[in-house]
């Protein structure tokens, strides 16, 4: 599901594929890229977490923060799980996210109805998914994450099933 949001003329919000299709028809209605304030600057809302940036909906008189937009994406993802109630979530974030951006991400999770949120840096999550904590994979590892618009890396040491993070870096 693309992290894309659109708002129609009545103010209804779409998230995901429907919003992405709206964006193809009219970039002003949907975004990873919404206009900031009165300028004509378009940016991805993930990149402005914790900056007090307001995104202006050009076809409706409405403003949203990055946290509010992120919460809409999380609510939609949560709705995909049928007949299950859960209140905890693990979210991956870019390696370069600041403490304020991480705090804003946790706030977005709360807005989406999650009571508990854990954050993992994207290259760390990738190394866990690959199974680097397995004992037969002892050694020093460089893990790259070529994510949607970011390039992150982590330098890890794995010994006896324990992963130690030396450094993470990204853009």
Question: Predicted regions: what is each one?
Answer:
Residues 54-55, 83:
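Intrinsically disordered or highly flexible coil/loop and linker segments, enriched in small
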Residues 56-78:
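Adenine-nucleotide phosphate-binding core of ATP-dependent small-molecule kinases
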Residues 49-51:
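Amphipathic alpha-helical blocks
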Residues 1-47, 60-63, 82-171:
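Oxyanion-binding/catalytic loops of NTP- or PPi-dependent enzymes
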């Amino acid at each position: 599901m693309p992290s894309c949001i659109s708002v129609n003329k009545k103010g209804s919000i779409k998230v995901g594929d429907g919003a992405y299709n709206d964006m193809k028809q009219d970039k002003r209605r949907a975004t990873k890229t919404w206009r900031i304030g009165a300028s004509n600057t378009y940016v991805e809302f993930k990149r402005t977490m914790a900056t007090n940036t307001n995104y202006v909906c050009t076809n409706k008189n409405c403003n949203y923060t990055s946290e509010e937009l992120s919460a809409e994406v999380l609510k939609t993802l949560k709705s995909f799980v049928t007949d299950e109630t859960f209140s905890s979530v693990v979210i991956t974030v870019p390696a370069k996210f600041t403490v304020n951006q991480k705090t804003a991400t946790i706030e977005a999770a709360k807005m989406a109805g999650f009571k508990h949120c854990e954050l993992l840096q994207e290259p760390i999550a990738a190394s866990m998914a690959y199974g680097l904590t397995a004992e037969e994979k002892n050694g020093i590892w460089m893990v790259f994450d070529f994510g949607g618009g970011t390039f992150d890396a982590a330098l890890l040491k794995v010994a006896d099933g324990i992963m130690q993070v030396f450094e993470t870096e990204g853009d």
